[in-house]
Amino acid sequence: MASTPPLSASPNSSKPTSPRASNRGLGLTSRQGSRSSRPSNDNGSRGVATTPIPDEDHSADLPLTMSASIVLTGLPKDAHQALADVEAIDSGKVTVRFQPLPSAPILRNRVFKISASQKFETVVKFLRKKLDCKDTDSVFCYVNSVFAPGLDEGVGGLWRCFKTDDQLIVAYSMTPAFG
């Protein structure tokens, strides 16, 4: 913001001689109207030399989002690397441990392996098959006994975020167990 020069009065003018006097009619307090009387921040006003903060050198390529440009012919190298990392993670198998809640039938073998690229729907179908459920029976599944994931959630993503001892713990019940 540019500072305004202090008001000065000529011998023949009827203008006020100070900023405070000029602000009395405007309803401004002395603090609001006395900005011009404050010392400026240039180098010669106080005798203290101020050095500008140097800009950082950004020599690395900044990552771009796909929405950054309408005409984006290819993905930036960071996006290629991120996609390759995600594909590598979801190409393996993850361990799923089924944990029965009260009043649920117990499986003989509770630990199974499933492809990380599968949806959680596959886990529920597999569990229904192992429990010999009818089409009308309900099975409620909860990850870590905390939440019920959507059927379209990826098993690899759930395992990465909520694994316990490198296993995805899926608690199951025939009746709703958690609100």
Swiss-Prot record:
Keywords noted in UniProt: Autophagy, Isopeptide bond, Membrane, Protein transport, Transport, Ubl conjugation pathway
Composition bias, Polar residues: 1-21, 29-44
InterPro entries per UniProt: Atg12, Ubiquitin-like_domsf
Region (Disordered): 1-60
Annotated CDD domains: Ubl_ATG12 (cd01612)
Linked residues for Glycyl lysine isopeptide (Gly-Lys) (interchain with K-172 in ATG5): 179
Subcellular location field: Preautophagosomal structure membrane
GO BP field: autophagosome assembly; autophagosome maturation; autophagy of mitochondrion; glycophagy; piecemeal microautophagy of the nucleus; protein transport
Membrane topology recorded in Swiss-Prot or TrEMBL: Peripheral membrane protein
Gene3D superfamilies: Phosphatidylinositol 3-kinase Catalytic Subunit, Chain A, domain 1 (3.10.20.90)
Record's function text: Ubiquitin-like protein involved in cytoplasm to vacuole transport (Cvt), autophagy vesicles formation, mitophagy, and nucleophagy. Conjugation with ATG5 through a ubiquitin-like conjugating system involving also ATG7 as an E1-like activating enzyme and ATG10 as an E2-like conjugating enzyme, is essential for its function. The ATG12-ATG5 conjugate functions as an E3-like enzyme which is required for lipidation of ATG8 and ATG8 association to the vesicle membranes.
Assembly and binders: Forms a conjugate with ATG5.
Family: Belongs to the ATG12 family.
Protein name: Ubiquitin-like protein ATG12
Protein source organism: Ajellomyces capsulatus (strain NAm1 / WU24) (Darling's disease fungus)
Taxon lineage: Eukaryota, Fungi, Dikarya, Ascomycota, Pezizomycotina
The encoding gene: ATG12
